[in-house]
Structures are given as structure tokens and as C-alpha cells.
Amino acid sequence: MRNPKAECQEKCAEEVVFEFKLEPQYGQGFYINENPLGLNALVIVKNESSSPVRLDITRYNRPTSNFIILAGDEFGVELDNIQTVGIFNRGHKVAKGKIIIIPNFSCINKC
């Protein structure tokens, strides 16, 4: 028999991983939520390149959030009402890395 707490944590923490490789001064959207109210999630960016990138997150009825992730750095933020997630390469070299989205991350500790 499965542990109910483990099942709850699995449901809350189904992560989605996107890999990016962007030319200099180029951006791309990686996630679009079809629910108009958006998604509550933890968004993590792992910048595995020597170029800084900008994380852009649009949200329902909230201002757009922008964060700079320096070369070789990691950044995570938990927000509500997420509609889109994108990355823009601010550097002069190819930028590559990963975007990890963990829906309903805050519920993990409530299970």
C-alpha cells in the first residue's frame, strides 16, 4: 500500500524541464498556461553558459516579473498566476541551460 503523504508530494511536485540554447540577443518562450488565471509554481533557471540571461514571467492580473541570471548561476522564484515563462539571452555568446517548473510547490510541505 502506498503512503498517502508520498502520493500527495508526487502530485504537488510534478516538475517540467525545458532545455534552452539561445543565440546572442535572442529570446524564446518555453511555457504557456492555457488556464487564464495561471499557475502557482516554483520556477528555477540553471544558466550553464558564459552569457547572462533574463527570465521573463507574465502573470494574470499582476505585473510582469523579470530577473537577470548571471553566467553559470542558478535562480529560483515561486510566484502565483503564471501565464508564460521565457528566456532572453543578454550576452554576446550562445546561452544554454535549463528551466524547471514545479507546479504547486508550496503544497509540498502541507502534505
Label each region the model flagged.
Residues 13-18, 52, 61-69:
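Surface-exposed loop/edge segments in extracytoplasmic proteins
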Residues 33, 43-49, 87-91:
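Asparagine-centered strand-capping/turn motif at beta-strand->loop junctions
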Residues 2-19, 23-26, 92-111:
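C-terminal interaction-tip segments
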Residues 28-32:
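Short, charged beta-strand/loop "edge" motif centered at a coil->beta-strand transition
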Residues 78-94:
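Noncatalytic modules at the cell exterior or secretory-pathway interfaces
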Residues 36-40:
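Extended extracellular/luminal ectodomain segments enriched in beta-structured repeat modules
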Residues 42-64:
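Short, surface-exposed beta-strand/strand-loop-strand elements in extracellular ectodomains
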Residues 25-27, 70-74, 82:
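Tight coil/turn sites that cap or link beta-strands
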